[in-house]
Structure formats: C-alpha cells, structure tokens
Amino acid sequence: VERKLISSKCEARGRVYIIDLLQFTNGCFANISEDQNGKMGAITVSIKTGERATSSSLIPESKGSIFAGMIGELLADKLHGIAVVSLYLREELDTDSMKTLINEVRKLLKKD
C-alpha cells in the first residue's frame, strides 16, 4: 500500500495554517489547522460516487463546516475515493483565505 504524507505551511491575511495530506491509493486524510502545533478540529467525510462527490459532517463546528466539505469534495473528486478532513480554526474564514487554502491544497495534490 503506497502512502504519502505531504505538508505545507500557508499564510492568508496574517493567519498561519498547517496543511497535512496523508494520501492512500483510494483517498486521503487531510488536516488543516490554524495552529503551529497542528490540532484536530471538525471532521468531515467526503466520497466520490459516480460523477459527484458528497460530504457529511461527523464532528460539526460553527466555524468553517461548509469549507471543510468543499475541501473534502475536492480531494475525493481528484483522488477518486474517500477524503476525511479535519479543520481546526480559531475564527471564521473569509473568502480570500478560503481561496488561498484551496489553491494550496491543489498545489499539494500536484506534488503527487
């Protein structure tokens, strides 16, 4: 079983995020944390079935739950499988920060 851990540090609007992707042949675990030490947060599971990816929150949180679903569906779609996403935020994300984080996740996927 091929596994690959890819990590990145990303800054958006003065906030620092750690992104970790642990890839498997049929999906990945992703952790996005607004903490230097990396913290677990709200958990969302996404899966690609047919042409679509769908998400479900296992551990919901008020900050960023829609964003976690977006990241999960992006990963499930690109990797043709299952994505489990943990998102830890200190405060709500603005649109520019979301775009920056999505672009960073896409860059990490290209390092494949």
What is the role of each PLM region?
Residues 2-78, 82-92, 98-100, 104, ...:
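Conserved mixed alpha/beta catalytic, RNA-binding, or beta-rich assembly cores of soluble enzyme
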